[in-house]
């Protein structure tokens, strides 16, 4: 892409455009003597030990300095916007927020929703795993950082500001507010592309550090049929102009604070409250600061993901400071581990506070990665402290700015403790898993563990590569751990989130795209049972009406059924679906329907009202779950039926009986209070600002305007389902059971209204019947059942004892029947007893040079072969079944089965003897 990026400021204030001889990129500078662009690796850090900002700032001070500057700017006042959660509930194509612009994708960028302010300023906590293997080493990389930004959305005919103003605002902030030296600032031209958008951009560099990026987003991915004259190429992809042009900036909060301190690493400047206690706990020796400074200067020019070799960095640093690589490693490794722990635990604090539940999928997988990587680092440092202790340090430090951390503290720390215990259990089981895999590799003559197996051990079993290597190398198998291992696994997880399946419709969208939107009578009056409508189109066995009271399947609520009356004949409606904004009804006799004909619809009301009870009941139950279990609870799915409903929630451990009783009690209290249930259509941004992102409990809701359902002082969600006007109409809510359907997800099965009454009546009937059988009153059933169970257990013990005695007698009797067949001792007999009796006796009789064949009168058989014989019990079992039918199998030394014809048992034993002889 070629574009003139000469701004007003560059032209009027004497800036010079130069080409960097090292990277070949163009940049702007006020310094006529400057040769290079200022970006590593073209330039080293020039602020380590010599801060580039006169005043030392804390994170809070720098953030406020930035936001206030833009909020109160005389010419361009910006609306200050609160941070968004790092878990992006408003979109389903990414796992975590990695930049401030992601807060406004896709809805604001596409024009489907208005921005909360325009222009706006924000400081957005952002999490990126693409740099995880650099964290702790380079001094500048974080998994969690705050991207301070100012954004302007230039809609057609409504310009705000563009390149000239953006560059001037950045320069003004840096030089007038932070007192940076103008001649040391460079603006490097480097086009940007990401998330399907692109545009020209400046990287703002100061003394070797990129402190901001100014992107002018004006292109979107080109469709296949794009006008060639409109297409531009940026970084190998093709784009066309967007209607909305967006100023997308990002200023690194941590980097600017680091610049003001000039410490060897950014971690020292912003995470000291964790780093210093960890250094004391680990007994880390203070080292020559020159080593850390030189390490940082060179590491700033290094990226593990690009170079893939940490050893190269070590060699270069060691050479510069005049020590061996081993001495350098010993000196800096503890610092790198502590830096990484401090960063990872801060990221975890944000993730868990915003509702991420550690698991094996999606964002939960990335949270678990951070937990286990941090634990591993602690162990390498020789520290046995709980990880929760470090997370608590972050909560204490950050809560004044992020009060939600204090509110969520108990849950956050409990999650960490639960995960640490799970990891310990994983490690106990892990060694055997690795050994089994190694045995398979050895059989194939492979002496190195493939990378895909290393990743599989981590993803499926949570075994870090270091643990796998430790076990494998003891077994003589080499393990090569890539320096960017964690980056690889994180990228794979993020790729899975980007995969979106295309919508599948019951009929081709092209067949209905020209039809008017179907009028949704079920929203206008959810209690409408009958209606008249006109047929607009018939497509196979689907009928399109101009309006309908039939609810189409969606949002976990099943479709309505009923009848459509046409020309005096009642036709069953068996399915209702929505394609775009057109509703289709599947009918049994489509040939009766003609375009323009008026029909009369009648719903199966019993089905609909029960769906409504369960749907409103789901919202009531969700409110109770959040209040009892915590704000981390999030809806992970739901499905309604007439007899029962299910609600899946994110939760990190099993729900206890006590918690279930409290949840059920709260839900039924809300029902009895007969709270109002109301709904309204609101512009998306207004709804988000009014109610927050808990709106999206049921998932991402498309559209500029969304339907918001409110249960008075209890629950608010964006929801497209049909609901009751008050909670009293739900009737009783009864939780039937809970299930753990996957890691981090609990399923609650419940019934409401008539379905709950039916369940309670059936339970009562069964209780009464059980009481009759025991001949006790219903209230005595539990203790009576327990008594019977204990008596049964005692009787079972006695039976087992007698069985063993019988087996001893059987063994004693059979030992008298040993005969010599060829070179083998042989015992063969038809006996009384169960398969367990036979197995017990055969195992007792089995000796090194002996074969035992026992067949019961019911047809069960057991074959035992001594260890000293070159025979397989399974082969002898085949001889038995070849004579008497049936089947069986087993290990080399023991096989069992059942024959079809017990009358041929003796004959089968003789056949085995023949084979041995």
UniProtKB/Swiss-Prot annotation:
Which residue windows are coiled coil?
none
What Pfam families does this protein's entry cite? Answer: DHHA1 (PF02272), tRNA-synt_2c (PF01411), tRNA_SAD (PF07973)
Q: How cofactor binds (record note)?
A: Binds 1 zinc ion per subunit.
| MF-aspect GO terms | alanine-tRNA ligase activity; aminoacyl-tRNA deacylase activity; ATP binding; tRNA binding; zinc ion binding
Q: What does this protein do?
A: Catalyzes the attachment of alanine to tRNA(Ala) in a two-step reaction: alanine is first activated by ATP to form Ala-AMP and then transferred to the acceptor end of tRNA(Ala). Also edits incorrectly charged Ser-tRNA(Ala) and Gly-tRNA(Ala) via its editing domain.
Name of this protein: Alanine--tRNA ligase
SUPFAM superfamilies in the record: Class II aaRS and biotin synthetases, Putative anticodon-binding domain of alanyl-tRNA synthetase (AlaRS), ThrRS/AlaRS common domain, Translation proteins
Q: Name the coenzymes or cofactors required.
A: Zn(2+)
Q: Where in the cell is it found?
A: Cytoplasm
Question: Which EC numbers characterise this protein's activity in its record?
Answer: 6.1.1.7
Q: Which positions, given as ranges, span the membrane?
A: none
Domains as described in the record: Consists of three domains; the N-terminal catalytic domain, the editing domain and the C-terminal C-Ala domain. The editing domain removes incorrectly charged amino acids, while the C-Ala domain, along with tRNA(Ala), serves as a bridge to cooperatively bring together the editing and aminoacylation centers thus stimulating deacylation of misacylated tRNAs.
What reaction is this protein's catalytic activity? tRNA(Ala) + L-alanine + ATP = L-alanyl-tRNA(Ala) + AMP + diphosphate
Annotated GO CC locations: cytoplasm
Q: Which UniProt keywords apply?
A: Aminoacyl-tRNA synthetase, ATP-binding, Cytoplasm, Ligase, Metal-binding, Nucleotide-binding, Protein biosynthesis, RNA-binding, tRNA-binding, Zinc
Enzyme kind, highest EC tier = ligase
| Organism annotation | Thermococcus kodakarensis (strain ATCC BAA-918 / JCM 12380 / KOD1)
PROSITE patterns found in the cross-reference section: AA_TRNA_LIGASE_II_ALA
One biological process term from GO is: alanyl-tRNA aminoacylation
> Which residues participate in Zn(2+) binding?
615, 619, 719, 723
Q: Which family does it belong to?
A: Belongs to the class-II aminoacyl-tRNA synthetase family.
